[in-house]
């Protein structure tokens, strides 16, 4: 089997196992960390994330994909330390979030691609840790002129390296379709793209529009019940399985062991089950109760992630 760039070194795709495809060790505002050295307690972040990952591993999770992009505070030294201490397989990302930052304006697409390329080919932040996936993002504003540029960066970086793309979307604004349009214009094979946050809707017909174009969809915000309750997320997956789409879905939480957007108290109040343990503990039993077979669960948690990373080679 081919290898994928892992945080602790190459991972044989045959050994990926149960994979959470969209998670975060830490989201921490880079400018605030630079301005205030005590903005985060790094040791506490690493310790908490290590505990969370070990708990997930005890429940059968073998690999976690950390999709934190550069401008959400990706810190590869934190990710690496957590992987080493937890003893788990992790895959890190390169790429950008959707926020339209002023400095993007003056950079051409190919110049940004050149800047990101070493993250995949050499190492991130002066380390030997190479990115194994490319993050792209489009939110409620849709594919603006600047967002198109960022999607083009992801597309060209993907085509230059063969590393897969995984996205953030606002599914209620149908931004996944807009992402697919830009990727297709750039010559991207849409079957090598994961369109994320599709689990935030019950609109099966809309999701089928994305699926029919070949992409995998991320049913990847389990635990964010205030956005859509678990039961509705589960029933949507069950409906798509019955319609024959099981080979194009992956599962995850989009959980953050540390996020500086909210207080810990607010996270506990709004999303008490938002952790790497929620899918093994609660979601998989609910899927089975809704008629999803163990074979289909394995397809979504093991086989589909493996296929995402097996499709390799520049083109």
What would you call each of these model-derived segments?
Residues 81-84, 89-161, 216, 222-226:
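Active-site gating/metal-coordination segments in enzymes
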Residues 67, 166, 220-221, 245-269, ...:
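Short acidic/histidine-rich active-site segments
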Residues 29-33, 76, 175-181, 203-211, ...:
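Histidine/acidic-residue-rich catalytic or RNA/ligand-binding cores of hydrolases
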Residues 17-26, 34-89, 110-129:
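Alpha-helical scaffold segments that flank or form the walls of functional sites
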Residues 155, 159-242, 248-249:
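Catalytic pocket-lining loop regions of alpha/beta-barrel enzymes
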Residues 2-9, 274-315:
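Mid-to-C-terminal alpha-helical segments outside catalytic/metal-binding sites
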Residues 22, 64, 158, 217, ...:
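Divalent metal-coordination and catalytic microenvironments
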